[in-house]
């Protein structure tokens, strides 16, 4: 039986990935800030979905992650789909800093916890949702672009570290783009 944790499963891509994995027979742990959305998704497959409310910007997020891993009895896949992005033409500092808190601090907190879990386990797969904005930058969303660049580079560096340490940890950075018709 394959097991995964999806952080950011309360909406969008994370929610859809959760649905797809359950359809494919996976047992999953889902996490996010909105408890009602977590329970609504859990109700679709209560025998295969467990939940844990967490906010990646809080220091306790890794404790919640480890609790979810324990409830599942271990995991094979860690999928991070938690993030924020806003247009900020006026460069309001609170918007920029909140984006950095979620997309850099929260991202780092969760991905390093997953990396260390898989290092101890001996194998695993870390998948993250990044953005094409991390390759070129978007003038209307400077913090979003910069944080996505950070994520791209961080995952590349972790993949190198895993190879250097001869770890069986695999990485997927899902850049969002529209393929040609």
Indicate residue ranges for each PLM-predicted region.
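Rossmann-fold cofactor-recognition segment
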Residues: 45-60
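Short alpha-helical oligomerization interface
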Residues: 89-101
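Residue(s) in the substrate-gating loop at a strand-loop-helix junction
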Residues: 131
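Conserved small/polar residues in nucleotide/adenosyl-binding loops
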Residues: 177-181
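Conserved NAD(P)H cofactor-binding loop of Rossmann-fold oxidoreductase domains
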Residues: 81-86
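Active-site helix of classical SDR
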Residues: 111, 147
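Conserved glycine-rich cofactor-binding loop
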Residues: 10-11
């Amino acid at each position: 039986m394959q097991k995964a944790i999806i952080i950011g499963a309360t909406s969008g891509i994370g929610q859809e990935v959760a649905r797809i994995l359950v359809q494919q027979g996976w047992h999953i742990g889902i996490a996010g800030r909105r408890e009602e959305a977590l329970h609504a998704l859990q109700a679709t497959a209560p025998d295969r979905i467990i939940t844990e409310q967490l906010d990646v910007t809080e220091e306790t997020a890794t404790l919640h992650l480890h609790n979810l891993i324990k409830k599942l009895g271990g995991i094979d896949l860690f999928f991070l789909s938690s993030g924020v992005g806003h247009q900020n033409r006026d460069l309001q500092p609170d918007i920029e800093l909140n984006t950095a808190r979620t997309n850099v601090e929260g991202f780092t907190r969760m991905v390093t916890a997953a990396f260390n879990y898989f290092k101890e386990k001996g194998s695993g797969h870390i998948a993250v949702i990044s953005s094409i904005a991390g390759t070129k930058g978007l003038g209307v969303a400077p913090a979003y672009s910069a944080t996505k660049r950070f994520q791209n580079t961080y995952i590349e560096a972790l993949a190198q570290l895993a190879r250097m340490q001869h770890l069986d940890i695999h990485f997927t950075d899902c850049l969002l783009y529209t393929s040609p018709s």
